[in-house]
Amino acid sequence: MLSQLVLDDNSIACLYVCVIRFFVVEDHILHATQGLVTRAFTDELWNMALSKIIAVLRTHSSYCDDPDLVLELKNLIVIFADTLQGYSFPVNRLFDLLFEVRDQYNETLLKKWALVFREIFELDNYSPIPVETEEEYKLVISRFPFHDAEIEKQDFPKKLPMSQSVPQIYTQVKEFIYASLKFSESLHRSSTEIDDMLRKSTNLLLTRTLSTCLQNLIKKPHIGLTELVQIIINTTHLEQACRYLEEFITNITNVSPETVHTTRLYGLSTFKDARHAAEGEIYTKLNQKIDEFIQLADYEWGMAESDGRASGYLMDLINFLRSTFQVFTHLPGKVAQTACMSACKHLSTSLMQMLLDTELKQISMGAIQQFNLDVIQCECEYKNCLCLPPWLGSNLLLPDFF
């Protein structure tokens, strides 16, 4: 009959009370009477009841998607097991069940925090955090471990390089660790086991939940070049903060990270992967934008003479590149350089394809001169390091795309 029940937490608690009462009475009869019941009979009855109870609990927990309810279920199991263990009934199978419930609890936490992360990313403005006063500055750094000597020297108001999602994400990771820790309470586990449990669940949060949210964010159509640049900056700061998360767990469990077999946090790879994905998306979006400008090109291939200056579409494209790469001044030099190289190579290839188009049957000298003016303009801007941040230097060796 137990296996046919559909239970909520209240009915489970009532079930536990009934079972405990029954077996406490059986235990009392066993020890207070002669020959009325035997230990073998009591053990057989207990094993049968335990199998039914475990089946019901396993089914109940598998359908529970609220971490608070799973936590209540765990607490009931612990009380039930501890009580009957006090009467010498074997409860190892119940503690084994707790490992399954723990996995279910972690899954519900991960789903909950996936929604939290998505909301944070949706509400972020992807702009540096403005701080007007010292109090505001202290409030931010109390939530996120940020230290920059140059920024600290600046007068107020000033801006911090990361956007508002960074301290929010960091705070929520810590909240997840606290929530994960709740399951370990009253389980009679060693500090090392709890430390390992926390680190493994946090790794799942970083490498699966947060990583997926970041990758999905980067691919969203409304995320432009400015937002991608900010995401790269954000992930850099989150990556640097991973060691503080390590310390946070260590302070909770008092288990040294140098202990043999201590699980390390994999946040570094999560944020590096997201950063590389954002960089790749920057290169892709730049090329797509170049294609849009190229589609505006309307050469009169039969024109008698050139206009004497670069084409309007090309100057618009160059102005776009100038303003776009100004946004890249906060990126590592290699990223800005690679983006410039990628954009210029794509532009030169597109111009070459335009000139060698098989549908183009005849070109006048005037059209060739006009096209040549455009190529010269591209070459001039490129060699002046239009697309490169000034700290890379003017002596940088540039491939001859044009």
Feature locations, PLM:
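Cytosolic small-GTPase signaling regions in large eukaryotic proteins
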Residues: 42, 49, 63-119, 123-125, ...
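Low-complexity, flexible helical/coil segments
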Residues: 145-148, 382-386
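Long alpha-helical repeat scaffolds
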Residues: 312-318
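Alpha-helical repeat/alpha-solenoid scaffolds of the HEAT/ARM/MIF4G superfamily
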Residues: 95, 107-154
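Extended alpha-helical solenoid scaffold regions that build the rod-like backbones
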Residues: 1-88, 136-302, 306, 320-339, ...
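Short C-terminal domain-edge/linker segments immediately following a structured domain
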Residues: 139-142, 378-382
